């Protein structure tokens, strides 16, 4: 998920540093943001980072400001406007998230979704048979699990099974440097590993298209998201 730390193509996307919007909520028709390093209230938002993007798209979807394809519904709010020939939303003063940004992000979240789905299928497992769902990398440390599930980036499963592994590659390298006996564990892991070449999966493109809907074309995979939609809007998109 490191690719999601900063969405390629978004003019306003920045790294998770001071001034970055890292959390978004929509309440009462207004967008509320949290800005990194703004405990004093003196730092203005400069852009949005990966976790903020996940929140923003999830909230736009739950409010009905974007549809299941991620397309803006300008009739729902005057915060959606047209700039430079395309629709966008002003999520903070002078900061805009464009339709092209949403479109590009949806491709990324779809790829993340089908990686999990195909790995489970090729391993002969159902989602409810998975004991743990580990999210590695610094992005996973800060992203909202609920928002990631809402947009279909993570599977809709028991929240207590979802574990933030942090920077597992760095931590693993440090442990190996301090204890060479762990090399034996690596050999065992390699023997048990299931290797999948996604490009060779017969229905890869079909699965990719299905995962480009919010949260997914098969909405039955996301029962908790459907409940959220009903509570926020008293309707279901499907």
Where are these regions (language model features)?
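Single conserved hydrophobic/aromatic residue that forms the stacking wall/gate
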Residues: 1-9, 14
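Gly/charged contiguous loops adjacent to phosphate- or pyrophosphate-bearing nucleotide/cofactor binding elements
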Residues: 55-108
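Catalytic phosphate/nucleotide-handling subdomain of diverse soluble enzymes
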Residues: 125-189
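Short beta-alpha connecting loops at secondary-structure transitions
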Residues: 10-11, 35-44, 97-101, 151-163
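Generic, well-ordered alpha-helical scaffold segments in large soluble proteins
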Residues: 56-64, 115-122, 133, 142, ...
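Phosphate/ATP-binding catalytic cores across multiple sugar-kinase/actin-like superfamilies
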Residues: 106-128
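A short helix-loop
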Residues: 15-77, 186-199
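Acidic, glycine/GT-rich loop-and beta-edge segments that sit at the periphery of enzyme/chaperone cores
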Residues: 175-238
């Amino acid at each position: 998920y490191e690719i999601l730390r900063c969405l390629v193509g978004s003019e306003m996307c920045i790294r998770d540093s001071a001034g970055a919007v890292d959390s978004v909520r929509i309440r009462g028709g207004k967008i509320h943001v949290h800005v990194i390093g703004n405990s004093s209230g003196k730092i203005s938002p400069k852009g949005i980072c990966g976790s903020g993007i996940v929140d923003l798209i999830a909230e736009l979807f739950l409010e009905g400001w974007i549809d299941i394809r991620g397309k803006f519904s300008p009739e729902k709010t005057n915060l959606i406007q047209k700039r430079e020939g395309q629709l966008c939303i002003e999520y903070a003063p002078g900061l805009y998230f464009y339709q092209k940004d949403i479109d590009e992000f949806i491709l990324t979240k779809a790829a993340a979704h089908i990686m999990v789905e195909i790995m489970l299928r090729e391993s002969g497992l159902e989602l409810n048979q998975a004991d743990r769902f580990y999210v590695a990398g610094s992005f996973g440390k800060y992203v909202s699990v609920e928002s990631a599930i809402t947009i279909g980036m993570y599977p809709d499963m028991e929240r207590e099974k979802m574990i933030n592994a942090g920077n597992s590659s760095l931590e693993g390298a440090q442990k190996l440097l301090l204890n060479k006996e762990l090399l034996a564990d690596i050999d065992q892991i390699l023997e048990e590993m299931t290797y999948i070449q996604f490009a060779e999966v017969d229905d890869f493109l079909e699965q990719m298209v299905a995962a480009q809907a919010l949260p997914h074309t098969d909405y039955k995979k996301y029962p908790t998201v459907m409940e959220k939609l009903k509570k926020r809007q008293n309707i279901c998109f499907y």
